[in-house]
Swiss-Prot record:
More details: SEQ4 or SEQ5 are unable to complement seq1 mutants.
GO molecular function: flavin adenine dinucleotide binding; squalene monooxygenase activity
Organism of origin: Arabidopsis thaliana (Mouse-ear cress)
Enzyme class: oxidoreductase
Chief subcellular location: membrane
Transmembrane regions listed in the UniProt entry: 9-29, 458-478, 483-503
Descriptive protein name: Squalene epoxidase 1
Binding site for FAD: 70-71, 90-91, 98, 169, 185, 347, 360
The entry's keywords: FAD, Flavoprotein, Membrane, Oxidoreductase, Transmembrane, Transmembrane helix
């Protein structure tokens, strides 16, 4: 009976919801793109005091890259391989020690292949990842990545973030036209509205300037330069508490594990042949103190009882060992100020909740888009013309970026427990929907993995989950209370996803062909406008 209702009611309800959504947002939400340039009030750049800067000589680079993390290193190698002179300035060239940026989705691995840097996941004891396992109240389901149509080498990868970054830095520095320097960038140099380079302190503490036709800021989630180039609206919905479980046998080998715990999810995935990363999400911006032992007590009394029994002992041992780290989870929609001579990339530009491990996939996909836009250009010195042309970047990146961003931020809200009964019904419906198999499983997983970055498909599945939850409530008897709860479930689902979509940009996300910048062509030398 439930199956028959599903087959008849679901398509009708989804269609009506989507029509309402497209009609309302397509006609009544004004695109945020207009006026971005005019909203630019406070600029933290400094005006160059060196007079007129000639950036056509041999003493300057074509591109300055600020930051040599995942985005900066990959970008430096990519542009260097295209014969650009690249100057990379990184605050600290020692191996990073982070608790995020350790899971690369299959879609991100495809971008590594496209950029020619797939060898950077070799020789670092990286582990292949073939899907996810979800756990909730004693139930468990396995979600496999839909990899059948891809080469056998294509899968997710998990690793120590620092090892991966060091491999990419070495790859970039191996090119003779890429200069990798340790230094702290203090500010951008601006002359007549165009960014001409940066002011920085080198490793010896000496203040210097560097000039280039294009400066790309990739200085990460703590960026101190982004305010010059975008309108940062950073939210911190939660914090991750990270541990390393040693010699731990996960219930499903070579899979990411998500425990739908109370109050919020727990993640686990292998980062080497002997280590498993465990990330405990703590809602809000304040976490129990690690120093006075509150955190250990929280992990043992609240978190440990909800862990799968296979990892319980390893989890307790990791807590007792005491190597516990925490970091805030940031989310920030891309809201750029198109600026001649400069561009933002990576976490400095756009962030989403790290629940789905999509950050590196977005960054690498952005680099592919930017590389393809810059390849036809021999000369980058016309800042105004280049800036106009690169406005297309913000639209062309949307299919991948908006899909992964929206899914990550929406899924986090769905996966957290709540005192709201309708929200908890949505959580239950999502877990059971993913376990139905067929398109109900492969569709969402292909979105999460970055293999099928289609925003409309994401919206369809999101509301399919909501409608599935309503159908469950109405069977076997649709009492007034259950009908009201179903209405609140649909309303709650809309309240989750619509604000995220609005922040991403409805027009660019669903109707990119209506954005003029979508059609911009590469300018020729001397042009001031893009056709």
């Amino acid at each position: 009976m439930e199956s028959q209702l599903w087959n008849w009611i679901l398509p009708l309800l989804i269609s009506s919801l989507l029509i309402s959504f497209v009609a309302f947002y397509g006609f009544f939400v004004k695109p945020k793109r207009n006026g971005l340039r005019h909203d630019r009030k406070t600029v933290s750049t400094v005006t160059s005091d060196v007079g007129s800067v000639n950036i056509t000589g041999d003493t300057v680079a074509d591109v300055i890259v600020v930051g040599a993390g995942v985005a900066g290193s990959a970008l430096a190698y990519t542009l260097g391989k295209d014969k650009r002179r690249v100057h990379v300035i990184e605050r600290d060239l020692s191996e990073p020690d982070r608790i995020v940026g350790e899971l690369l989705q299959p879609g991100g691995y495809l971008k590594l292949l496209e950029l020619g840097i797939e060898d950077c996941v070799e020789e670092i004891d990286a582990q292949r990842v073939y899907g996810y396992a979800l756990f909730k109240n004693g139930k468990r389901i396995r979600l496999a990545y839909p990899l059948e149509k891809f080469h056998e080498d294509v899968s997710g990868r998990s690793f120590h973030n620092g090892r991966f970054i060091q491999r990419m830095r070495e790859k970039a520095a191996s090119l003779p036209n890429v200069q990798l320097e340790q230094g702290t960038v203090l500010s951008l140099l601006e002359e007549n509205g165009t960014i001409k380079g940066v002011r920085y302190k080198n490793k010896a503490g000496e203040e210097q300037t560097a000039f280039a036709a294009l400066t790309i800021v990739c200085d990460g989630c703590f960026s101190n330069l982004r305010r010059s180039l975008c309108n940062p609206q950073v939210e911190v919905p939660s914090c991750f508490v990270g541990l390393v479980l040693e010699n731990c046998n996960l219930p499903y080998a070579n899979h990411g594990h998500v425990v739908l715990a109370d109050p919020s999810p727990i993640l686990m995935y292998p980062i080497s042949s002997t280590e498993v990363r465990c990330l405990v999400d703590v809602p809000g911006q304040k976490v129990p103190s690690i120093a006075n032992g509150e955190m250990k007590n929280y992990l043992k009394t609240v978190v440990a009882p909800q862990m799968p029994h296979e990892v319980y002992d390893s989890f307790i041992a990791a807590v007792d060992k005491g190597n516990i780290k925490s970091m805030p989870n940031r989310s920030m929609p891309a809201s750029p100020y198109p600026t001649p001579g400069a561009l933002l990339m990576g976490d400095a530009f756009n962030m989403r909740h790290p629940l789905t491990g999509g950050g590196m996939t977005v960054a690498l996909a952005d680099i592919v888009v930017l590389r393809n836009l810059l390849r036809p250009l021999r000369d980058l010195s016309d800042g105004a013309s280049l800036c106009k042309y690169l406005e297309s970047f913000y639209t062309l990146r949307k299919p991948v970026a908006a899909t992964i961003n929206t899914l990550a931020n929406a899924l986090y809200q769905v996966f957290c427990s709540s005192e709201n009964e309708a929200r908890n019904e949505m959580r239950e419906a999502c877990f059971d929907y993913l376990g139905l198999g067929g398109m109900c499983t492969s569709g969402p997983v292909s979105l999460l993995s970055g293999l099928n970055p289609r925003p409309l498909t994401l919206v369809c599945h999101f509301f399919a989950v909501a409608v599935y939850g309503v159908i469950r409530l109405l069977i076997p008897f649709p009492s007034p209370k259950r009908i009201w709860l179903g209405a609140k479930l649909i309303s709650g689902a809309s309240g989750i996803i619509f604000p995220i979509i609005k922040a991403e940009g409805v027009r660019q996300m669903f109707f990119p062909a209506t954005v003029p910048a979508y059609y911009y062509k590469a300018p020729t030398v001397g042009e001031t406008k893009c056709s």
